[in-house]
Amino acid sequence: DEVMLDGLYGTAPRQLIDMSMYERVEVVKGASAFINGMSPGGSGIGGGINLIPKRATDDPITSVTTFYEMNSQTGGHVDFGRRFGKDNQFGIRANLKYADGETAIDDEDRNSQIGSLSFDYRGDDTRITVDAGHNEKNIDHGRTSVNLLGTLTNIPDAPDASHNYNADGTWADLEDSFVQGRVEHDVNDYLMAYAAAGTRHMEESGIYSTPRITGTDGTMTYGGSTIIREDTTNSALTGARVKFETGVVKHELNAGVSYLQNKSHQAWAFSPSASAFTGNIYGPTPTGYPALAAPSGNLSDPGL
């Protein structure tokens, strides 16, 4: 929620971001709200993160890649880009990626399906971009982070990097789709007007585990939860930038207005403390799952 997509909040994929559809990541230091508006969660203090989608370059791009990663993750990636028209004014860039199998973490399986399409126009004084993407990830027995009991006197050493200490039976399905556009127009050599708008729809479901280290020997307790979530976000930004000089001092001012609407439907259930079971961060993967109780919302349809 705190990551921008080409300067627009609310349209970047939630939770897991696959870099195969992006050209670069920009770390914006300083008061970025003056340029891109305030982050939705209000936590982007002192800077921001901006994802720039892949777009067609002056040189044609045709790339087909296959890969194999430990332990048995295999897949392929197709990247295609062309420019055409007078002075290469128009550009199109497409990316497709598929990956499936066990990751380098023991017994963690991931399936990824990624697709993106970008169109851009660059005229003498006007620039237009349209970006669309779909990001789907299915994770089975994913390794999560751990919490520490506040009264621990020492923090246990980290286990082997490939060891999966998470409870068996956990899974997560995440699906994101977005489309957005941006227009920039140079009114003259000193003034530029811009506008951007986009929308994103996200669906997430899963059964999660929350391991907590309670002993210096690596003993842990496991709680659990199931969460169903659907988000629809609409975002827009418009403004102008002006450059001028006073003597030897050069100035650049930005004035803009941003809008963001997020509709979120959620339902969940958590395991009571009495149903938590124990394990060890160094030991074998725990089997079973704590019983869930006290559901909130409709787990079959969180919109109800």
Predicted regions and their residues:
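Periplasmic plug
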Residues: D1-I35
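Outer-membrane beta-barrel translocator/receptor signature
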Residues: S20-E23, S32-G115, Y121-R127, S177
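Outer-membrane beta-barrel transmembrane domain signature of Gram-negative proteins
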Residues: D59-D79, V248, V257-L304
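Transmembrane beta-barrel strands of outer-membrane/channel proteins
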Residues: V64-Y68, A94-D100, V130-E136, A195-T199, ...
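Repeated loop/turn-to-beta-strand initiation elements of outer-membrane beta-barrel proteins
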Residues: N88-F90, D125-V130, Y190-A193, V248
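Acidic/polar loop-and-plug regions of large Gram-negative outer-membrane beta-barrel proteins
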Residues: A99-T103, S116-D186, T199-D231, S275-G303
